[in-house]
């Protein structure tokens, strides 16, 4: 099993929790983490707000699975809804969950160590690896195919 707690440390964790906490203080508060990753921030949000629920969105199915396992181990799975999607699909995600309002939205934009350190994903320039660079590996279009088939104007 991958020790995800040591793969990616959430950036500015205490500051993020302190910023989100006031919005999540009331009963039935709903938070959305639009870039769930390995759930470091989300676990802290749910621990700080025991009455809140959280929808975790990520387009990386591997990260989503690992985050879900972490939530289960932390005893937070009953207040966590994992969703495989991109953050620009937030409106649809909320509609699918019959949620009309949220109290807090969080985004930690960029790559995580999970993507960079996994050589075969092709995000690191430090290793000779396939030029994949897909955040969602279920999608067929790789960086290699783009570079091989797109003309300069498309790039």
Identify the function of each model-found stretch.
Residues 1-155:
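S-adenosyl-L-methionine-dependent methyltransferase catalytic core, i.e., the SAM/SAH-binding region
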């Amino acid at each position: 099993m991958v020790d995800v707690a040591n793969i990616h440390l959430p950036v500015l964790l205490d500051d993020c929790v302190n910023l989100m906490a006031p919005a999540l203080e009331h009963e039935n508060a709903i938070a959305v983490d639009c870039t769930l990753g390995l759930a470091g921030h989300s676990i802290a949000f749910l621990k700080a707000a025991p009455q809140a629920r959280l929808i975790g969105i990520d387009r990386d199915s591997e990260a989503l699975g690992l985050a879900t396992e972490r939530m289960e181990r932390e005893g937070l799975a009953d207040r966590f809804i994992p969703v495989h999607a991109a953050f620009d699909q937030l409106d649809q995600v909320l509609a699918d969950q019959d949620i009309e309002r949220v109290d807090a939205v969080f985004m930690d934009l960029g790559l995580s160590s999970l993507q960079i350190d996994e050589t075969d994903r092709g995000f690191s320039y430090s290793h000779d690896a396939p030029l994949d660079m897909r955040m969602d590996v279920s999608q067929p279009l790789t960086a290699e195919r783009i570079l091989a088939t797109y003309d300069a104007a498309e790039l």
